[in-house]
Amino acid sequence: MKDNIALIGFMGSGKTTVGKLLAKTMDMKFVDIDKVIEAHEKKSINDIFHEKGQIYFRDLEREIILQESLKNDCVIATGGGSILDNENIKRLKETSFIVFLNATIECLYLRLKDNTTRPILNDVEDKRKLIEELLEKRKFLYQISADYIIDINEHTNIYETVDKIKEIYIIS
């Protein structure tokens, strides 16, 4: 059994929400990569993107994932774009049981349509279209990176989701 559980998926798929509850029920530590980045930079993800750019952010994200994945007994919530870097997935595969929270486009849209903290979605007129386009580009990477895929929709029960992940992790 691997030491950690890493949650991957598109922004808004529930990685942080599921991760917090999963860590609590399994008596593990919870690590939100975006929050670690914000603490490191003393700035919001939005501000980092605007002031230093996406390349800087992705480099920092890689560094933080490498550092945090070396810890034991953690549930790690990754950023939605973390799978775009092969090094992130390579490291997570070495140390973590990877779960893809496969949320529907409708679910993602409902969760993200009024959100202003996601730099990629800011100043975008048709958020649903951008979500569809980005998810289409990323979905294969999420799928091939995952040890387990769990489907998420707007009616998914978080407790059932956590129970499924816990059960699969224990028997893995």
Curated annotation (Swiss-Prot):
Name of the top EC class for this enzyme: transferase
Cofactor or coenzyme needed: Mg(2+)
Listed Gene3D superfamilies: P-loop containing nucleotide triphosphate hydrolases (3.40.50.300)
Protein name per its UniProtKB record: Shikimate kinase
CDD domains referenced in this protein's UniProt entry, alphabetically: SK (cd00464)
Membrane-crossing residue ranges in chain numbering: none
Species in which this protein is naturally found: Fusobacterium nucleatum subsp. nucleatum (strain ATCC 25586 / DSM 15643 / BCRC 10681 / CIP 101130 / JCM 8532 / KCTC 2640 / LMG 13131 / VPI 4355)
Binding site for Mg(2+): 16
Metabolic or biological pathway, per its Swiss-Prot or TrEMBL entry: Metabolic intermediate biosynthesis; chorismate biosynthesis; chorismate from D-erythrose 4-phosphate and phosphoenolpyruvate: step 5/7
